[in-house]
């Protein structure tokens, strides 16, 4: 339940609230939407540092960069789809990939979790391309 609630709240707060506020704050400036996506994505990435604390610095940096890149993806999908439910569902899909890790006693993802994540990410990429093409 935690993974579901966190994903929904992050999207409501970062994309639904902050991204819109920042975009309006930049007003008619060129690239206002891009700036809003980038700022909220960096905040999203920084927010994920806490989940990586205690890991090697390379892992902390990788998770932060990965989360920032996902933030850009979620922000862009939100802008293109004009529907906050789309990034929420994408976010939940990614969060659910982490559930098998919760039941592992090692510091490594079980093979089934890696396969699940890989399949999910491929489907997310396909869906992202579909949304962009549909709206162009």
Label for each model-derived stretch:
Residues 1, 13, 64-69, 93, ...:
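Membrane-embedded alpha-helical segments of multi-pass membrane proteins
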Residues 3-7, 41-48, 71:
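Alpha-helical transmembrane segments of multi-pass membrane proteins
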Residues 8-13, 17-18, 22, 46, ...:
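Active-site His/Glu-centered metal-binding helix of metallohydrolases
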Residues 12-39, 56, 76-83:
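Membrane-interface helix/loop boundary segments of multi-pass membrane proteins
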Residues 36-42, 86-98:
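Central hydrophobic cores of alpha-helical transmembrane segments
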Residues 45, 61-76:
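Hydrophobic alpha-helical segments embedded in the membrane of multi-pass proteins
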Residues 49-65:
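Interfacial helix-loop-helix junctions of multi-pass membrane proteins
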Residues 90-136:
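C-terminal membrane module of polytopic membrane proteins
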């Amino acid at each position: 339940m935690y993974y579901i609630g966190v994903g929904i709240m992050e999207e409501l707060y970062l994309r639904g609230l902050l991204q819109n506020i920042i975009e309006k704050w930049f007003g008619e400036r060129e690239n206002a939407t891009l700036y809003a996506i980038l700022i909220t994505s960096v905040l999203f990435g920084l927010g994920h540092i806490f989940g990586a604390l205690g890991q090697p610095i390379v892992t902390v940096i990788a998770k932060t960069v990965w989360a920032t890149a996902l933030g850009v993806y979620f922000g862009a999908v939100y802008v293109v789809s004009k529907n906050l439910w789309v990034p929420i569902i994408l976010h939940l899909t990614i969060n659910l990939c982490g559930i098998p890790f919760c039941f592992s006693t090692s510091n490594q993802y079980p093979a089934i979790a890696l396969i699940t994540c890989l399949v999910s990410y491929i489907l997310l990429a396909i869906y992202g391309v579909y949304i962009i093409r549909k709206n162009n």
